[in-house]
Amino acid sequence: MATVKKDARLTSSQSLMCVGFAGIFSKTVTSPLEVVKILSQVGTFHCKRGFLHSFVLICQNEGLRAFWKGNMVSCLRLFPYSAIHLATYKNIVNLHIDELGDISQWRAIVAGGLAGISAALATYPLEVVETRLIAQNCQEPTYRGLLHSLSVIYRNEGLQALYRGFSLTVLGAVPFSVGCYAVYINLDKLWQERHVRFTSLQNFINGCLAAGVAQTLSFPFETVKKKMQAQSLVLPHCGGVDVHFNGMADCFRQVIKNKGVMALWSGLTANMVKIVPYFGLLFSCFEMCKQVCLYRNGYIISPPSYKLKPGVDQSLGPYELQEFKRYLRNRKSHKAQSSSIGNRW
């Protein structure tokens, strides 16, 4: 997947803040596409007549604000998910790096997959709540916000309902990782043959293509997971799910039997359309936030220009740079005091 490159000139909290803000911004802007995708996966009536008509039906039945159903929960989930993912990924990578500090691309992708599973496990109840909020009619809501949703689901359906379908996250990670690996290996060969220096644009292209292939391969697992998250016997129309089933295997069977194999890829169009604007906004917003932090840390003259500050060692970390500046100030102060004493004599 496309990744925002870690910059040693940022503190850990600044990196997390930049990723979080960029994620919130890109999620919020592309939320209408996410809503259409999830409603298509669940199988609600909005999406029976295709991608474009889904927007019309949602707007007619629930209004414009329906395109941001569940977005607040999705944004709140981003921070614990990112923190757990980053910490787990670092620990796994540290176990597999060689003597030179390098790690193979396959191991790095597997580490990313395992970190993703760990982060998903910790934040899975929030994902279930997001799906329920999107699947419900916001004009006649059963759930009102995060805490109310968690309490109602737990009270009416038990703790297991908050983890229903999690096994599909694990199963879907396999084709997802294979897809990422295949794309990155082939793209690396392509860039090397052209003998060009790797740029941010290439990283963006790699990320979009890898996301497209990996998400397409793992999409059936994601579709069944969304149906399992949304289905509930205590909700009107069983949560809006278009097939009735008992468990994961039966869900696959019923979807194929009643809707056809291609129904496992319902919502893929919205997902593909979302990839480029999502990653474009993510990268752009991250870079803007990073430049503000670099300015505050004393590495650049101003955020818009991104001109490096003369005389500043860009290889120093933020804490090292502050210590170095403090040392220079103390040294200058000491020299001034020595000069003052010499003048008196």
UniProtKB/Swiss-Prot annotation:
One Pfam family cited in the UniProt record for this chain: Mito_carr
PROSITE patterns in the cross-refs:
SOLCAR
Keyword annotations for this protein, in alphabetical order, are:
Membrane, Mitochondrion, Mitochondrion inner membrane, Repeat, Transmembrane, Transmembrane helix, Transport
Solcar repeats by residue range: 11-100, 104-195, 199-297
> According to its record, how does it sit in the membrane?
Multi-pass membrane protein
The family database entries (SUPFAM superfamilies) matched by this protein are listed as: Mitochondrial carrier (SSF103506)
- Tell me the compartments it is located in: Mitochondrion inner membrane
Its predominant location is: mitochondrion
Task: Provide a GO CC annotation, any one.
Answer: mitochondrial inner membrane
A GO biological process held by the record: transmembrane transport
For this UniProt entry, which segments traverse the membrane? 16-36, 67-87, 109-129, 165-185, 204-224, 261-281
| Ribonucleoprotein listed as a keyword | no
Q: Which PANTHER family does this one have?
A: SOLUTE CARRIER FAMILY 25 (PTHR24089)
The similarity comment for this entry is: Belongs to the mitochondrial carrier (TC 2.A.29) family.
What name is this protein filed under?
Solute carrier family 25 member 43
- Species for this entry: Danio rerio
